[in-house]
Structure formats: C-alpha cells, structure tokens
C-alpha cells in the first residue's frame, strides 16, 4: 500500500511533469497541500523534503517552495554521453510490434543509442506513466505510438512539456492531430479502400467491415471502406459496419458476426477486417457455421503479419512496412536530436506516409451467383 507522503510526492511530480507547474513556479503552501490531499503537516514536509533532495523543487527562505528548472540541470557534455532513446508502443511482444522495435533498435544501436521500451497496452493511464518516466529520466528523444489516437487524449500536456524541455519526438502508426507531430504511418484511408475495392472487383456486394474505432487507423480504414462503396454506387447496409473499442476487441466483433451469420437469408459474401489478428479470430466463427473460405466467403486482413499465414487459410491482406517503419523512425529521431530541429509540422517534409500494397493469397475469390457460379 502506498504511503501518504509518497502519494503527495507523486502528485506534485505529476503536476511538474505534465507542465501544470512550470519551472520557478510556486508549489502550494504547506497549508494548501494539507487541505488538497487531506494529510498532516508532517506528511507534506516529508514529501517536500524528498522532492528537494531529488532536485524536483527548491525552497526560498520566507517565500515558499518552487519548481526547479530541470533543464538547468542538464549538462551538455553528459547529454552527449547519454544517448538514450525511449520507445513507447501500445504493445511489445504481440503482433507487428516486435518487427517495428527490431527495425528501430538496429539503427539506434548502430549510432550508439541505448533504447528503453515502454508499453501502454493502449491505455491512457499507462501512457501517462511512460511519459512521466521519459520526462523524469531525461531521454534525448522519443519514438511513440499514440494511445487511442482517435479520441481526446488526457496526456497532451506531457507532449507539450517534452517540447518545452527540447526533447524531440516522432509518432508512428497514428498521431494526435492537435500536436501536428512528425509522423510515420500508412495511408490508412487508401488501405481500407484497397481492401474493399479488391472484394468489389471480385463481384462481392454484401460486405461486412469491422473496424476498431478508438484508434485513428481504424477510423481512417472505415473511411476508405465507405469511399469504395460510394464510388461503385453500392448502398451500404448499416448493420454491416461493425465498430469496437480496445476493451471490446475480444468479444464484440465475434458476437456481431454470430448475429449476422444466424440470418441465413442475408449472409454477406465478403469481410473486411481491421487487421490480421481480428481476421484470424473471425475464421473460428466462420468455421462454426460451416462456411467455406474463400468458396462462400472472402476475407481480407490488414498488416501482412505472421498471423496472415498462420492458419490453413492464407490471408489476403494489406502490407504494413513494420521493420522499414522502425528504421525510418530511428533515423528521423536521430536527425531531430543531432540537428536540434524545432518545427514539428505534420505536413512538413519529415513525415513519411507509406503506400498500402495488397498481398493476394487464398482467402478471397470471385463472388458466386445464387446458382453457385462466379459472377
């Protein structure tokens, strides 16, 4: 159980790291802190004493306690010797992330940088803890994959504080629009469009799309899905668009597909999946209904991960750059650090957008007519 003084200490540190209390800004008085955190004077003093000893705050006789300017504590020589990069991803050992990490580490280690890796599990609180660690330990730069990038983020102040402290960052796979950061990611609108167009070209008209909508990638892939239908003049069945959040990803898509397949009279002939991971899970549901892939149902994944060839049905999918993205992100953050660039405009020359490429395997085929022949 966390002690009261440590709780107060961590709360004050969080305000400093978030940029709520700026360097040389006054920390609340003892009485104010006692009231705010409902603790004793002894607890407040113990918390402040430790913060003073650790260089977070300083006292002025008769004036109070103030936030220390930690940028003043940075030794330029020491900074050159540190060469530490933080890498924050939503996941570490799952799916495409080991390949991205491997690509980044190969370049960073080649240039003498040490890499510390954090995972958020696509959770804002865990992202906050990772950013606090980055700001506390004074990394030279940060490569970060945003957390739940399509919804308002409570941690934007931490990124602004990184900028204030001169710590550059680049974002991969998605970005926070309000920050306009350097960004490396796929053209996900075109990716979703390409998935859908492939099925439409094969004669499929009843297509289900499943997209994770708390990440920007999912929102953009859905946009591409809708765009492809509009271009063909094919009206979408609203019940064939299934969206879900990170917390729902293991249940809702499967439950919704069960619901759709139970209605034999309006079964779809094609499915567009947010990623390969989802596609593989859906194959289990499809087997339950004795539906054959691709003879009766075509399925398209996204990312061309190792999972795309892990099943007996090899997935048609969209290729994700993975290792290449990691390499490019590492080169960009090194360039930002060594040239001390300040401009982080998202539409500047430093952002990299990768073109989606369709990898056709065995999970898609021409749609069959009611008589069982190709259209």
From Swiss-Prot:
UniProt-recorded name of the protein: Arabinose metabolism transcriptional repressor
Subcellular location: Cytoplasm
InterPro entries (UniProt xref): AraR_ligand_bind_dom, LacI/GalR-like_sensor, Peripla_BP_I, Tscrpt_reg_HTH_GntR, WH-like_DNA-bd_sf, WH_DNA-bd_sf
Gene3D superfamilies from the UniProt entry: 3.40.50.2300, Winged helix-like DNA-binding domain superfamily/Winged helix DNA-binding domain (1.10.10.10)
Keywords, sorted A to Z: Cytoplasm, DNA-binding, Repressor, Transcription, Transcription regulation
Gene assigned in the entry: araR
Keyword Transcription regulation attached: yes
HTH gntR-type domain mapped to chain residues: 1-70
Organism whose genome encodes this protein: Halalkalibacterium halodurans (strain ATCC BAA-125 / DSM 18197 / FERM 7344 / JCM 9153 / C-125)
């Amino acid at each position: 159980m966390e002690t009261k003084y440590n709780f107060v200490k961590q709360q004050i540190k969080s305000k400093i790291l978030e940029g709520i209390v700026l360097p040389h800004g006054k920390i609340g008085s003892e009485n104010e802190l006692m009231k705010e955190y409902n603790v004793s004077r002894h607890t407040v003093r113990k918390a402040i004493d430790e913060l003073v000893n650790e260089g977070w705050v300083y006292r002025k006789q008769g004036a109070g306690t103030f936030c220390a300017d930690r940028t003043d504590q940075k030794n330029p020589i020491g900074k050159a010797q540190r060469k530490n990069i933080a890498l924050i991803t939503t996941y570490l050992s799952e799916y495409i992330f080991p390949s991205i990490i491997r690509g980044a580490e190969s370049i960073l280690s080649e240039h003498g940088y040490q890499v510390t890796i954090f995972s958020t599990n696509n959770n804002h609180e865990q992202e906050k803890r990772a950013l606090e660690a980055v700001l506390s330990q004074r990394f030279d730069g940060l490569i970060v994959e945003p957390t739940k990038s399509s919804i308002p983020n409570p941690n934007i102040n931490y990124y602004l504080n990184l900028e204030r402290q001169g710590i550059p960052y680049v974002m991969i796979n998605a970005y926070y629009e309000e920050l306009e950061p350097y960004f490396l990611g796929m053209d996900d609108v075109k990716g979703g469009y390409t998935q859908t167009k492939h099925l439409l070209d094969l004669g499929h008209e009843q297509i289900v799309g499943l997209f994770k909508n708390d990440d920007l990638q999912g929102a953009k892939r859905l946009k591409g899905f809708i765009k492809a239908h509009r271009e063909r003049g094919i009206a979408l069945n609203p019940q064939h668009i299934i969206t879900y959040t990170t917390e729902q990803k293991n249940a809702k898509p499967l439950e919704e597909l069960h619901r759709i397949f139970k209605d034999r009279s309006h079964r779809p002939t094609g499915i567009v999946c947010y990623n390969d991971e989802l596609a593989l899970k859906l194959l289990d549901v499809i087997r339950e209904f004795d539906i054959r892939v691709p003879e009766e149902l075509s399925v398209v994944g996204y990312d061309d991960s190792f999972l795309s060839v892990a099943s007996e049905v090899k997935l048609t999918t969209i290729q994700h750059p993975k290792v290449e993205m990691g390499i490019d992100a590492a080169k960009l953050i090194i360039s930002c650090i060594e040239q001390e660039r300040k401009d982080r405009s998202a539409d500047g020359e430093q952002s990299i957008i990768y073109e989606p490429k369709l990898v056709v395997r065995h999970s898609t085929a021409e749609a069959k007519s009611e008589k069982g022949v190709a259209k």
